[in-house]
Amino acid sequence: MISTGIAAQNRKGRFNYTILETLEAGMVLKGPEVKSLRLGRATINEAYAGDRDGEIWLFNSYIPEYQGGVLSRFETRAPRKLLLHRKQVDKLLGAVARDGVTLVPLDIHFNARGVAKVTLGIGEGRKKADKRQAIADRDWQRDKARLLRNKGRE
């Protein structure tokens, strides 16, 4: 059971997109959805956030049915409303109006009070060359750390 910490993470989100800014939003969830999230079985790899009637919603996130209860029937891929202030919604909708910018859910976590939150990133899609450069940079950082770690042993 996860009382605080990350319940689901979109690991490809930071790789496929250059994240310009992050924002934390609350989620409207039912009881069995929260229990299922606390078990850590949710996935947001194909999820995205978008506009519906002037509000921000999370689409295509997968929260499996909670197996512990009898009345735990809910749609696993239902759109879920995100709770934001009006100024934040206007800012996000203005950012998404630009070409090539999208809202990427980066993780779902429980804060210190045990409330489910989703971290949204305003991201621009990366080209294939940018992804290759990111891989090369990551490999160089790993090799550099290995060289520094082994330097004293020689």
Swiss-Prot record:
Q: Which UniProt keywords apply?
A: Cytoplasm, RNA-binding
Disulfide topology? none
Q: GO MF terms on file?
A: RNA binding
Which Gene Ontology cellular component annotation is one that this UniProt entry carries? cytosol
One of the GO BP terms on file: trans-translation
Which CDD domains does the UniProt entry name for this protein? SmpB
Q: Where in the cell is it found?
A: Cytoplasm
Q: Which Gene3D superfamilies match?
A: 2.40.280.10
Its job: Required for rescue of stalled ribosomes mediated by trans-translation. Binds to transfer-messenger RNA (tmRNA), required for stable association of tmRNA with ribosomes. tmRNA and SmpB together mimic tRNA shape, replacing the anticodon stem-loop with SmpB. tmRNA is encoded by the ssrA gene; the 2 termini fold to resemble tRNA(Ala) and it encodes a 'tag peptide', a short internal open reading frame. During trans-translation Ala-aminoacylated tmRNA acts like a tRNA, entering the A-site of stalled ribosomes, displacing the stalled mRNA.
Q: Supply the name of the protein.
A: SsrA-binding protein
Which organism is the protein's source? Gluconacetobacter diazotrophicus (strain ATCC 49037 / DSM 5601 / CCUG 37298 / CIP 103539 / LMG 7603 / PAl5)
